[in-house]
């Protein structure tokens, strides 16, 4: 159907009735809503009347072209809007996918961390030994752990022993603090030890004065004293027999007295002359006596050749032997006392 024919066949019509849009750029109050959809210059011609020059056929043709162009423009706009919507949707979808991936990664990391935490807790529980008791939070002043109970019992025992020591040591109750208490106890014990040593020394000295016999000496030196006593007893008996026999009917020649500085002898000591055999015996005995004196570290060194030209009698030797005997006894007693004190 030709729109121009239809328009010619019909009766008279008005363009304003057919085209409801404003003409010549003039709009009414009711056309404000329509202008939002199709505005001025929408179809390329600002004034259809001027384009048709008053010819209805041209006006209809121009109107049809304008309608066709408006529809095609609307389609294009719809296509553009759909394309832009698709782009926006694709961008939003990509962003959503990225967010979902990130959320999934975070969730996976949390799940892995939780799984690792549970595994470590299980391993710790396996490594820890099973406790025989149930741990309960202790009240104030009370304990539930066996180790803490044992420690408390040990401390109570220590405090009891410290109290006993404080009661034993005089003046220790006034001291405050375990360290100071222990210092006081140590000082008191050391003073007691010194007193015991002093009393033991005093007792040994008293016993040595009261019982100076052989039983005081140790068993190693008892044999030496017994041998010396036996030798002296034999020597003194022979000396007495010799002097008694030699003095019968004979006069003893008295020689000048020689005082030996190292022996500290008195000046009233007499020496007697003997027969040649006796002189020979005395010289041999004097040499042996000199060796014995040097061995025993006594300050007496007797020799007939060095100290005097005359033979020495047995009286002089008896005197020296007595001195040696007393010196040995004194030396042994001193050694015994020293060993007892420092042992």
Swiss-Prot record:
SUPFAM superfamilies: HLH, helix-loop-helix DNA-binding domain
Any one GO BP annotation for this protein: regulation of DNA-templated transcription
Keyword line: Developmental protein, DNA-binding, Nucleus, Transcription, Transcription regulation
SMART domains: HLH
Pfam families from the UniProt entry: HLH (PF00010)
Keyword Membrane: no
Protein function: Involved in the control of petal size, by interfering with postmitotic cell expansion to limit final petal cell size.
Binding partners and assembly: Homodimer.
Name of the protein in question: Transcription factor BPE
